[in-house]
Amino acid sequence: MSRISLEVCVDDPDGLEAAVAGGADRIELCSALGAGGLTPSPGLMAVAAPPPVPVYAMIRPRAGDFIYHRADLEVMRRDIDAARHAGLAGVVLGASLADGRLDARMLTKLAGHAAGMGLTLHRAFDLVPDFAEAMEIAVDLGFERILTSGGAKTAPEAVDTLERLIELSAGRISIMPGSGITSDTIEALVPRLAITEVHSSCSSAEPANDMRLVEMGFAAPERRRTDAAKIRAMRARLDAPAAKA
């Protein structure tokens, strides 16, 4: 098995530094990881470039569902423009219909607007009723990879499904497991799965440093921060001989 790439999601400048220092191969740049990841600000995109490793910006204009309308599309197009202007390598996209299927028309418009940039399909994929249908849409639109937990809350809970997705992909698109992947849980996935990349936050919990901020509603009692040591630990597990067996 060839070297497995590690993508780390971050949502602030400190996270960017930690990801690079820890040895991430690619960065998913977001804001508000506590809400599942939203579009980063143009300022954060600019700080991320020129990056020492490829950076893909999450394009998700709001928390909640992935059902987008005309006004959302205009916002997302402008966010893609900001990522391109910042010199980022790619964008992370997803859009759903009310029944959970991928919104092929919306994704066609978004992918077309991002022409020339790398494309990752995010975990809107995990909500679809038919993985095969959704994968064909992603392949037809030129996505490089699908970030997925196999439809479960965490990827280690859905190893059998992930294995089927990899077989279904037939080398046409990368299946990148994500959600709940740590240096302790990665052994559930490799070497069993023939994957070339994984996604993780590699983060540590950190309590709020001022409870007044929590009381006033400006901060959560706890937040996750990208941890360079956890990235190094994950990298070591991925590079271990057992992971390549």
Curated annotation (Swiss-Prot):
Q: Which GO terms describe its molecular function?
A: copper ion binding
Where located? Cytoplasm
The answer to keyword Oxidoreductase applying to this record is no
| UniProt KW keywords | Cytoplasm
**InterPro entries in UniProt:** CutC-like, CutC-like_dom_sf
- One GO cellular component term, please give it: cytoplasm
Q: Name one Pfam family in it.
A: CutC
HAMAP family membership: CutC
Q: What family does the database annotate?
A: Belongs to the CutC family.
Q: Which PANTHER family match?
A: COPPER HOMEOSTASIS PROTEIN CUTC, COPPER HOMEOSTASIS PROTEIN CUTC HOMOLOG
User: Which protein is depicted?
Assistant: PF03932 family protein CutC
Q: Which organism is it from?
A: Rhizobium meliloti (strain 1021) (Ensifer meliloti)
- The coding gene here is cutC
